[in-house]
Amino acid sequence: MLNIYRSVLFPIIFSGLKADPEWAHHQVLNMLSFIDTHSDSQLVNSIRTTMEKLFCFKDTRLEQNLWELNFKNPVGLAPGYDKDGQAINMWPQLGFGFAELGTVTFHQQPGNAQPRLFRLPKDKAVLNRMGFNNKGAAALAKKFQIQNKKNSFFFPYGVNIGKSKITPLEAAATDYLESFRLLKNCGDYFVVNVSSPNTPGLRSLQNTDSLSKILEVLPRENERKKPILVKIAPDLENEAIAAIIDLIKEYKISGIIATNTTINREKLTTKILPATGKPIIEEAGGISGKPLTKRSTEIIKFIWQETKGKLPIIGVGGIFTSEDAWNKITAGASLIQIYTGLVYQGPGIVKQILQGLLKKLDEHGLNSISEAVGLANK
């Protein structure tokens, strides 16, 4: 299937006549949503069965138990792909071990002006300046209730929460809290997103004074002790990351996600953005994909070393191959997420990564993926 995607669909999607990336993204979600909501159709059920055969790969050596949640494999869908849970029950059929929905905000918002999503094929990257476009926390909570997780087996869902654009920075903690209140009984884990470059001032919430206010109020509302994680930017210096780690320890936060998109443009091959004709350094937004591979892995390794491997890490940034995934895991990530790799390589990427990880376990004489976590630091 991966070869079909590369040889047939990839050239169409990335041709000179390619459709707007955001439009194409919506068409994929609409298709998955249709399959998801027509489970009473014999044809649709046949499609779902075929999808499972094509994309799913299971082996007990890939399973982990983290935060008392069972992950069938370590490869998750990164947030941004299914912000509103439009295809909420389809991600297991595509082979994922978990899916993170969102980013969702308390207030429904349209996001930034279009065009706001661009592919950079020369760099195997994506530039986005979406701006947390979503239908709001209440709508996502309703989606969870309607769908009621139709899967007959447990599948972990994360919920990534951001600040509403209309909410002043000084009121950010309340904004995050209101979203959490609406969703706390829906997701299996929650993420405090203070690292997107596409909401004015959001990254300033990574400073300890601002972040502490958010991390102080959420646990009070967290009666069921759901895991809460913090997602950080790749552009932080190690000193700032260490300060966030100290805060995470202080408030007994469950983990950290490294990393979000980068605003760094230095090593990009793309100099002019074809869609606008402007220099890439003048284009706002965050870069995901291959340019992030090395830096995100470095940060994962730093966090693992700073915490002596005691703080669970979800690694994300430039994962295209099983080698990329292995490097993230051995640097210290218990779980990983993909987004841009899925865009460029299609749904077969998950199965390819999982099969490659098993080969790595065999090569190193390991019995489970959990034994590989942080291996490069030992």
Swiss-Prot record:
Pathway: Pyrimidine metabolism; UMP biosynthesis via de novo pathway; orotate from (S)-dihydroorotate (quinone route): step 1/1. Disulfide bonds: none annotated. InterPro entries: Aldolase_TIM (IPR013785), DHO_dehydrogenase (IPR050074), Dihydroorotate_DH_2 (IPR005719), Dihydroorotate_DH_cat (IPR005720), Dihydroorotate_DH_CS (IPR001295). FMN binds at P79, G80, Y81, D82, K83, T103, N160, N193, K231, T259, G289, G318, Y339, T340. It is a peripheral membrane protein. Substrate binds at K83, N128, R129, M130, G131, F132, N193, N198, N260, T261. Its EC number is 1.3.5.2. The active site is at S196 (nucleophile). SUPFAM superfamilies: FMN-linked oxidoreductases. Keywords: Cell membrane, Flavoprotein, FMN, Membrane, Oxidoreductase, Pyrimidine biosynthesis. Its cofactor is FMN. The keyword Cell membrane applies. Binds 1 FMN per subunit. It is found in: Cell membrane. One of its GO terms (biological process) is 'de novo' UMP biosynthetic process. GO terms for molecular function: dihydroorotate dehydrogenase (quinone) activity. One of its GO terms (cellular component) is plasma membrane. It comes from the Bacteria. Pfam families: DHO_dh. It catalyses: (S)-dihydroorotate + a quinone = orotate + a quinol. Belongs to the dihydroorotate dehydrogenase family. Type 2 subfamily. Monomer. Catalyzes the conversion of dihydroorotate to orotate with quinone as electron acceptor. This is Dihydroorotate dehydrogenase (quinone). It comes from Trichodesmium erythraeum (strain IMS101). The lineage of its organism: Bacteria, Bacillati, Cyanobacteriota, Cyanophyceae, Oscillatoriophycideae. The gene is pyrD.
